[in-house]
Amino acid sequence: MNKVITDLDKALSALKDGDTILVGGFGLCGIPEYAIDYIYKKGIKDLIVVSNNCGVDDFGLGILLEKKQIKKIIASYVGENKIFESQMLNGEIEVVLTPQGTLAENLHAGGAGIPAYYTPTGVGTLIAQGKESREFNGKEYILERAITGDYGLIKAYKSDTLGNLVFRKTARNFNPLCAMAAKICVAEVEEIVPAGELDPDEIHLPGIYVQHIYKGEKFEKRIEKITTRSTK
């Protein structure tokens, strides 16, 4: 089955207000630039977003904050966005800060069909408030629940026409997990090859988790902070 599309509208036309989207990336590395721009232009709002971060003021998920399209964000780091900070302090957006490893495992559990699991991370902190706790072998654990979403929006380096994906280095990050935990996964890629051309050993995410593949013409790939030094 050829999963390649040339128009994101074919994959995202059913995305509606109030849906939950799982967005890959770490900072600005490996983010689905085209899908985010599509949502921004369509004005889809009241979204529940699950992502490592919320982009920067004018790029990534940050552009969805400009028109207040995000109702709730579940993330592990949100410190690079002034618009986000303002909306959070003014009570305009619901924020669920989650330890990074816990966020990854919540998505993994969702993709694996595991409804909940116990972890020691967050015990004795604000993270544990309102959560069930139990003791195992003399150590306290809190119950974390799996995360699933309506759409997984991810970015990969290469795909074959069946949706088998290859990521590049750190750009892999949360992308495979967002694909696994979503009902529908839309993968943006830089290169598409015929089915059978990828060595099975180099495939990072099997095509069973991917419903649509979109080849971007050019990815901006911004850097959050550029640090330079004098040539002297």
Swiss-Prot record:
<dbReference type="InterPro" id="IPR004165">
    <property type="entry name" value="CoA_trans_fam_I"/>
</dbReference>
<comment type="subunit">
    <text>Heterodimer of a subunit A and a subunit B.</text>
</comment>
<dbReference type="GO" id="GO:0008260">
    <property type="term" value="F:succinyl-CoA:3-oxo-acid CoA-transferase activity"/>
</dbReference>
<feature type="binding site">
    <location>
        <begin position="24"/>
        <end position="30"/>
    </location>
    <ligand>
        <name>CoA</name>
    </ligand>
</feature>
<protein>
    <recommendedName>
        <fullName>Succinyl-CoA:3-ketoacid coenzyme A transferase subunit A</fullName>
        <ecNumber>2.8.3.5</ecNumber>
    </recommendedName>
</protein>
<comment type="similarity">
    <text>Belongs to the 3-oxoacid CoA-transferase subunit A family.</text>
</comment>
<dbReference type="InterPro" id="IPR037171">
    <property type="entry name" value="NagB/RpiA_transferase-like"/>
</dbReference>
<dbReference type="InterPro" id="IPR012792">
    <property type="entry name" value="3-oxoacid_CoA-transf_A"/>
</dbReference>
<dbReference type="Pfam" id="PF01144">
    <property type="entry name" value="CoA_trans"/>
</dbReference>
<dbReference type="InterPro" id="IPR004163">
    <property type="entry name" value="CoA_transf_BS"/>
</dbReference>
<keyword id="KW-0808">Transferase</keyword>
